[in-house]
Amino acid sequence: MDFYKSIALDLEILGPQATDSLKELAYHRLEDKIVRLEFRPGIFVTEKELADSIGIGRTPVREAIQHLATAGLLSVLPRRGIKVSEVDALSVLRLLEVSRSLDIAVARAAAIRATSIQRHEFSRLAEEFDSVSASNDSVAQIRLDSEFNNLCMLAMGNEHARKMCRLIQPLTRRFWFAHH
């Protein structure tokens, strides 16, 4: 499952909760570009540049920008513009302290609650991890890690944990891209 199929699956799963799927799609596409450092930390960008980069109109992008600012990936500075947040090692280390405990709880619950279809998907991901781990394809490794995390959260079925993970994971993935 590629990254954008994963996003589509997320939107399908959210159903009526995804009141504005374009906003969600804009958020995920911009998050991916920021995490992969396509927008370098510390640079200023315009709303138009962001919208053009993902091929989505400015209104959903404007809403996604607010969400990305809340997540700590962008800073909206009055009269100065939109700044891609810096990657702060100490902050990420503190995030990892929280993430570790949360990841353990999510994985345990997912192992207990996973459906047979989800268990099959876990097996497929494990096989793909094995084949990719021998390569130095960091993009594929990060993609698989993200798919694994999404599947764990889905299998766990706890929306509160899912929201917390959604805040932490992009920041830790971006740190990995910046320092790997």
Annotate the PLM regions:
Residues 116-178:
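Conserved amphipathic alpha-helical segments that form helical-bundle/coiled-coil interaction surfaces
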Residues 1-108, 112, 160:
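Short linear motifs at protein or domain termini
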